Amino acid sequence: DHQESADYSKYLEKHFGSPDEFTNEQTVWHNIDGFKRVVCRDEYILHGSPAPHYDFVYCYVDLEVPEDMSDELAKCSGSILIDHLKNEVGARCGSLTANATTLNFVMDVVAGRTEAVKDEYEKRILGMKAMFDNGEKYELDWWPDESGDADPGNEYYKEGYITLEGTRCWKGY
């Protein structure tokens, strides 16, 4: 139903091969690009923070988040998904790069390197986007970016911005 998520799924398949799981609703890869699991869902969720964009790809890592941090992390972004039973954290964004940025923020909060504050989270997402817009590749120590998702020369992102339903959105948050 949602062409954008279908296109991104094809982009992932080009770089990582056929998905490990495939249904009419989603494609799933296990243990790729530094993530425990990557799920591309047939959805297109408008998310207004820190600027309008659409979410449809989920990335997960193993990370034990203390329960007393959950509420504060949830206030930072609706894109942060915590599963205390699995000791797993997910991010739902519009690209692997945005998900890696989101997960890195959670890792930094859990490790005590930063506070769980919405302004800090948004600063990181906007910083990632600014680097991309300036032709700089975004990098994280733990994330290998095997698909070149964070490369500003990536053909998938050549359009940069899209307009849907009257809303100008950045493609790839």
For each predicted feature, which ranges?
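Non-cytosolic coordination micro-motifs
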Residues: 1-26, 31-37, 43-173
